[in-house]
Amino acid sequence: MALFRELVEAAEAAGRVSGRKEKVRILSEFLGRLSPEEASIAARFLAGHVFPEYDNRELGVGYSLVREALKVLDQKPLFLVEPQPPAITEVYRLLERIAGVSGEGSREKKLKLLEGLFSRLSRKEVEYLLRILFGEVRIGASTGLLLEAISRLSGVPYGDVLHAYMVLSDVGDVAFKALESPAALGKVDVSLFHPVKPMLADMAYNVDELFQEHGSPLHLEYKYDGLRVQIHMGRGKVRVFSRRLSDITEYVPDVVERAVEGLHVEEAVVDGEAVAVIGGAPVPFQELLRRVRRKNEREDFLKSLPFELHLFDVIYLNGKSLVREPYSTRSRLLREIVVSEEILAKKTVAYTRQEALEFYESAVRSGNEGVMSKRHSSVYKPGIRGSDWLKLKSFDTIDCVIIAAEWGHGRRSGWLSDYHLGVYDEESGRFLSVGKTFKGLSDAEFEEMTKRLLQLKVREEGYVVYVKPEIVVEVDYSEIQRSKRYPSGFALRFARIRRIRFDKSPYEVTTLRELRERYLRSIRAKRWSPQ
């Protein structure tokens, strides 16, 4: 039975070497010594997760509770026999128990469980455990490194391992299958009622760029400002999943109704956007959510919203995965299973620059964000952002995660209101700062954000509160600049929060690679114009 101590030693060993191949070797050899269950848990821990990414359980362990539990380290009797160090599986089971504690007296129960766990760990092991709990940094490797390690130990090609991860949505599940049945890992595919990560789009800055990348003709769709939904239908059931893979079926009855009425099919998994419509016009969904402050209130609010459904892809049909089929085939099959094309995203084929511009302008006039262009030959790549899909928006933003916040002054005194913004570095598995801003939110949002951020507090230094990277915000900016001040090497000029993205996970934010690409493009074209 592998000890948690061994995981920490492997993480430290991987952290000490600089070469990617050597990191992969260390992680591969460590995971290869474990049972499938142990490897599953260890892979998640090394990636900075306790539970699978699609698992909505929360530990509910805050900074103050941890600080109190840490006192047990200073109270260990020196004359007693050292307690048995916990196995990796024991640590996981204890964290499961902590997540399951609720109701009256839950804080005291969680405290006792944490104290019991901390008392069996060394200070170094506690440090690593806290980094897992707070998601402060990935403790051993980025997900990419772990997938390479899994490929090495299983002998399964990296492309197949990556595909399995995108379908299973959990590096732990991939590690389990790699050790239990490597041959089966290469056959993992989309299945009914198991949500997969949605395919994502790169940003384009003008119509000419769409033609340069995708050629003529362009296959364009409206880009809606709604709720990304993945709908699974079959066996007499309908399930709706969010982009974070949460089951939101009960909160969107309109979406379920429109799917049942609009699709004529035995089994299917379709991808689309649910758009809130008030007074016959689309309303920016995230703007509506800004009015609702608490999570349970947001869920009730969702139920009350009238939604229209706009489908744009089908990735599973009557027992067969379609993710390896070209977009042209998937688009045709989607048209064949809808009762009426009203349920489809509005599309066109543009042969000329003028036709593309007119479609873009009609999308914006209709209250939408812009347009999407999709390469006709592209396969569906779950969880992958790339140039096969390009989005052209009427405004330019990036998604950042809040990694720290500062106490405000003057009118904002008493609120955490100056937010440190981070992008994701895929190489290191860390979130790196690109600047900070206090602009864009209302007083009510400052108040609610202060409560949420304090619940996510990891530590406090002076007037800066460092938090678990959990809250995603969409950020406007005027320019990306080179900067030695921030670890990312870049800074956002005149950053302003456009909206809070409750629907996005921290690992969906803009990556450092994407930010670097935007910076290089901005050198060529300082001011963006759709024309």
Curated annotation (Swiss-Prot):
One of its GO terms (molecular function) is DNA ligase (ATP) activity. Its EC number is 6.5.1.1. Keywords: ATP-binding, Cell cycle, Cell division, DNA damage, DNA recombination, DNA repair, DNA replication, Ligase, Magnesium, Metal-binding, Nucleotide-binding. Disulfide bonds: none annotated. Its cofactor is Mg(2+). ATP binds at residues 221, 228, 243, 273, 312, 385, 391. Belongs to the ATP-dependent DNA ligase family. This is DNA ligase 1. It comes from Thermofilum pendens (strain DSM 2475 / Hrk 5). The lineage of its organism: Archaea, Thermoproteota, Thermoprotei, Thermofilales, Thermofilaceae.
